[in-house]
Amino acid sequence: MPYKHKIPIYTENLNLTGAYFRHQRIIDGLSLTYVADAISMNKGFLSDLENGKRNFPDGTINQLNDFYNLKFDDSLKFYIELENNIDEIFHALCNSNTFKEKQLLELILSKRDIYENSSGFFLFNLLNLFYLIRFNCNETFINDAKKLIESNLDAINSKDLSIFYCILGIYYKRNPSTNFVAEKYFKKCLSLSSNIPDIAALCTFELISIYAETNRSALAYTYCEKSRSIFNRLQNYTTMFFIDFFQCNCLTNLGLYESSIQKLTELLNNIDQSSNKYISTMYHSLAWCYLLNCQYSECIKYTNLAIENKDPSCDLCYFIPYSYYKQKEYLKCLDYIESHLEYADDFYKPFLQSISARIQKQYVDFEKNIILYYQSLLQNNVYEGIPLIQNFILDYYTETNNKDMIIKILIDIKSFNDKDLTLKSSTLFVDSSS
């Protein structure tokens, strides 16, 4: 085997050149045999070059450039340039400096012609994926960029691979139904980056909401503590505010409502309420906590404050009518639903319709709509709202003395508390296995 020249540590053992030409051959739809014959090279030797097992002899890169009609530059200049940039960009992401993050990414993408013909090709495409996930969200482009990186992991160092997994985690975390996919990527990221503060910090932080949303609130609470410790060392106090906020939500999910209300109120008192853009989210969390704690007047108060401050959350649509229902203010409840139903998100309409049907003793409509909504919660892994609905269903079957259904919903409640309730395991759906 030819002697391998010593190269900088962050490129050692990376297959930058071989992977580049391998990728080109594959996208051109050419077989290894065809290319080897066309350039009069041994097939096994060409395979070794493509897979980083041999150095490229003098003249071979030019030979392949001519064959593919490319202008590949194998110097490390552009790779090193991008390596420095990706660290700066990720640091901006970790510090919530979205303006700088986007500005740097757009500057790099403006030099596509340079980077795509250099040793920085794969790192450039990783940064392109970074931009797509953070600022474009075109699913087709994201999947194409993801496949390109996944097919050439031998050209990505472990630190950049951890960034790849982290941004994929961010992408899949946006939809509750893919939270478990996001968790897998964040864990992969942490396995590679435990000693890289920025990456470990962001991954740990992102896992908080995943655990909270997937009925693992105690674990989410412990990750709040882990995350706070890392961000404190980084002196990233902005993110520490969010950690405190998430910890309040964990307390709510654990049923520690008074502790959550106290902590949320302290956070509210410690910020400038006239300018803070997250004030509506905090009102929302307080409204939700009061709803679960059966303090319905307070729930209505903070729901209205959240709406007045333009909180975008769709689930607010049922806080007020449900509170009216529980307070036996049935006319107010029906009037509210009638005037707001057409503006509600389709996901929550069955719940609103079930409340209306329950008041009017339209039992068939109630059962149809509440089961449809419960099924949607399970199907989309929206675990946070499940206990409220389970108790709503239990109250109904208790009132109608349907012992078979009481047993079924009690089994589901136990499964939820045991952390193993899924759409498939739920006892309420005859067709749950389909």
Where do the PLM segments sit?
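A short, Lys/Arg-rich alpha-helix, primarily the initiator
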Residues: 1-28
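DNA major-groove recognition helix of helix-turn-helix/homeodomain DNA-binding modules
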Residues: 57-74
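Short alpha-helical DNA-recognition segment
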Residues: 28-48
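Alpha-solenoid helical repeat architecture
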Residues: 116-122, 156-163, 195-206, 234-246, ...
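Amphipathic alpha-helical segments of tetratricopeptide repeats
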Residues: 106-113, 146-154, 187-194, 225-236, ...
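Tandem amphipathic alpha-helical repeat scaffolds
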Residues: 84-95, 123-137, 163-177, 201-215, ...
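Helix-turn-helix repeat elements of alpha-solenoid scaffolds
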Residues: 93-108, 133-149, 173-188, 214-226, ...
